[in-house]
Amino acid sequence: MNQSVQTIMIIAGGTGGHIFPGLSVARYLMNHGYKVVWIGSKDRIESELVPVYNIDIKYICIQGLRGKKIYQKLITLLFLIFFAMYQSFKIIRCWKPDIVLSMGGYVSGPSSLVAWLYGIPVIIHEQNRIMGLTNRYVSRFAKKILQGFPNTVNGAITSGNPLRYEILSIPDPVHRLEGRTGPIRVLVVGGSTGSFIFNKVIPEVFGKLFGKLIIWHQSGKKGFNDTIQAYKKLHCNSSNYKVVPFIDNMAHAYSWADVIISRSGALMVSEISYVGLPAIFVPFNYHKDYQQYWNAFQLVKSGSAIIIEQERFTSDYVSIILGNWNRKVLLNMAILSKSLEMSNATQLVAQTVMRYLNGK
């Protein structure tokens, strides 16, 4: 390894909400002459996404602890975590990184701890409005803490959430939405794996408001066939809806949409605000700390979005809301959403790491 090039190790895994911000920062650092390496989990999406960018990635075996019974947690603590630390030790000894940027996910816990034991400085970035369990532990020995939303952690640097590069070129809401006519375009995104409740309710909404909506629906792979059948049973014109397992080009989807219905993961909320889209958020209801609810709270407070708890997410209720929104209302909501965006997060996160390496 060329020792004249400083090596930055990114630790991130599990979901796109951790992976995509990490990739944005990695690309920035690589463009500025740094070597970037990555620790993740082999059975999660980072194993597919990270190599595409010519980033060396190695894997550790780890899984989440939340929601398990006490004896299962103990087994995980005694075996999986210690094994993950052993794997991390071998990886870090091989790569000898100059600094670690932990972007969250369960994978970041053991690897960050081993880096700290090696005397390697650790910087963390918390994407969510409520700090995740793993980052809470890592924050105890982190040299710096960056946060995607204000007031998440006392003393942290508010950077915003690094966004995918392709999102940054989307025109602002006025140029994009003003002058549009026709049915309201509704983008439905239930995360990378889809959402059962969206797949059940949205076809019913489409039927109730037929002729008033055009739907682009990401169903996830598992829910794809059932969702397609739900739309077909309505015997409606198929040109007014499109169901796909996964949307590869989110920039195009965001540009196309007038309004979005989605979960409120941190990255999704940040992207929606940057693009300037009215939103109906349905927070994932199994987080004990209501993490997704608080991610969306600022947009709701601004009047650019609403939150519907999953228990109230019915076709009747959603139909009433969408039926009452016209293009003037949606444009005003989009402008309010855009006013809260933080577009330079990638640069802020990367430069924080670079400055620390350079002793500034």
UniProtKB/Swiss-Prot annotation:
Key word Cell cycle present: yes
Positions annotated to bind UDP-N-acetyl-alpha-D-glucosamine: 15-17, 128, 164, 192, 247, 292
EC numbers on record: 2.4.1.227
Enzyme class: transferase
Reaction(s) the record says it catalyses: di-trans,octa-cis-undecaprenyl diphospho-N-acetyl-alpha-D-muramoyl-L-alanyl-D-glutamyl-meso-2,6-diaminopimeloyl-D-alanyl-D-alanine + UDP-N-acetyl-alpha-D-glucosamine = di-trans,octa-cis-undecaprenyl diphospho-[N-acetyl-alpha-D-glucosaminyl-(1->4)]-N-acetyl-alpha-D-muramoyl-L-alanyl-D-glutamyl-meso-2,6-diaminopimeloyl-D-alanyl-D-alanine + UDP + H(+)
UniProt KW keywords: Cell cycle, Cell division, Cell inner membrane, Cell membrane, Cell shape, Cell wall biogenesis/degradation, Glycosyltransferase, Membrane, Peptidoglycan synthesis, Transferase
Chief location category: membrane
Subcellular location: Cell inner membrane
Gene Ontology terms: cellular component: plasma membrane
Pfam families: Glyco_tran_28_C (PF04101), Glyco_transf_28 (PF03033)
InterPro entries in the cross-refs: GlcNAc_MurG, Glyco_trans_28_C, GlycoTrans_28_N
Recorded metabolic or biological pathway in which this protein acts: Cell wall biogenesis; peptidoglycan biosynthesis
UniProt membrane topology term: Peripheral membrane protein
Entry's Gene Ontology BP terms: carbohydrate metabolic process; cell division; cell wall organization; lipid glycosylation; peptidoglycan biosynthetic process; regulation of cell shape
GO molecular function: UDP-N-acetyl-D-glucosamine:N-acetylmuramoyl-L-alanyl-D-glutamyl-meso-2,6-diaminopimelyl-D-alanyl-D-alanine-diphosphoundecaprenol 4-beta-N-acetylglucosaminlytransferase activity; undecaprenyldiphospho-muramoylpentapeptide beta-N-acetylglucosaminyltransferase activity
Keyword Cell wall biogenesis/degradation tagged: yes
Function: Cell wall formation. Catalyzes the transfer of a GlcNAc subunit on undecaprenyl-pyrophosphoryl-MurNAc-pentapeptide (lipid intermediate I) to form undecaprenyl-pyrophosphoryl-MurNAc-(pentapeptide)GlcNAc (lipid intermediate II).
Similarity field: Belongs to the glycosyltransferase 28 family. MurG subfamily.
Record protein name field: UDP-N-acetylglucosamine--N-acetylmuramyl-(pentapeptide) pyrophosphoryl-undecaprenol N-acetylglucosamine transferase
Gene: murG
